[in-house]
C-alpha cells in the first residue's frame, strides 16, 4: 500500500489554522505531517491549500485523535475490527497507537521514536541482517534503516496496524528510495512464519511483542527456541518486556524471559525496559 501524503490534522492544529485566518492572515506556516516538515499553507474562507491541493475546513474534531483526508471529508485514523485501533498524536511529533484504549508505545517521558532508537542501538544493526518480529508502526525498522542496517525482515500480524502505517509519516515505506530495498514487510503471524526462516540466517533480532496476556505464544519456550535457531552465534536480541507490576500480576515476566532465553541458548540480562540477550 502506498503511503498517504495529504494533511494530518489534530483539533489543536485545525483550530490554529482557523484562528490564523480569522486574524486576517492568508497564510500559515507550520507542520501538517506530525513535525516531519514545515509548509506554507494558503488560507481562505473555503478552507486551505496544502502542497497544491485544496481542502475544506474540517468539522468538529475530537481530542487525542488524528484526522486524514478520506476524499470527501476529514476522517479519524481509527478502525474497529477485532478491536478498536487508533493512531494517537503525541507532543513529540511521532504518534503512538492504541488498541482498545491501551497505549502500545511509551510517550510519557520520551518520543516513541527516540525510545525505539535507544533499543535499536543495543543490537548495533549497521550492515547486519535483522529480524523485526512484531513490526507495529515500524519505528524499530525506521531506526535500523537510519543506522545503516543491511537487510531487515519485519512481520506484522494485524492488517489494521499495517493500515495505520500507511497514514503515519514516521512509519517507514518499504518502497521509498531511502529504504533502498532493505526493508521487507510481511503481514503474518511471526510465531508461525519464523518456522519458514532458515537456520542461522540473521545477525540480530528485535522482539517487541504485545503484553504476555495477549500474546503468550511470543513468550513461550517453543518460540524462543526458534529465535535461537535463526540467529547466528554471537548475535544480539533485544526483547521488550515493559515493567509489569509483580504485585498485581503475580509474576516477574522479565526474569521468566531471561530464564527461557538462557534455556534456548542465549546469555541474557536486563536492559532498558526489557532483556538483552546474546546467542552463545
Residue ranges and their predicted role:
Residues 126-137:
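Conserved class I S-adenosyl-L-methionine
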Residues 155-199:
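S-adenosyl-L-methionine
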Residues 219-233:
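A short glycine-rich, Lys/Arg-flanked "PGG" loop and its adjoining helix->strand segment in the class I
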Residues 234-242:
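Conserved beta-strand signature within the Rossmann-like core of class I S-adenosyl-L-methionine
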